[in-house]
Amino acid sequence: MARYRCCRSQSRSRCYRQRRSRRRKRQSCQTQRRAMRCCRRRSRLRRRRH
């Protein structure tokens, strides 16, 4: 099962496949479609950190 992570602000239209990375745990989506949704949502929120 390939997991996709939300794209970064630089490239919203793209969602990357998640590789093994112990450093940071980003939001991971099980399907590319979900990742795309995540991308769009993130682009809207922009920099809104708690």
Curated annotation (Swiss-Prot):
The keyword Signal does not apply. GO terms for molecular function: DNA binding. Testis. One of its GO terms (cellular component) is nucleosome. Its main location: nucleus. Pfam families: Protamine_P1. InterPro entries: Protamine_P1. Keywords: Chromosome, Developmental protein, Differentiation, Disulfide bond, DNA condensation, DNA-binding, Nucleosome core, Nucleus, Spermatogenesis. It is found in: Nucleus; Chromosome. It comes from the Eukaryota. GO terms for biological process: chromosome condensation; sperm DNA condensation. The keyword DNA-binding applies. Protamines substitute for histones in the chromatin of sperm during the haploid phase of spermatogenesis. They compact sperm DNA into a highly condensed, stable and inactive complex. Belongs to the protamine P1 family. Cross-linked by interchain disulfide bonds around the DNA-helix. This is Sperm protamine P1.
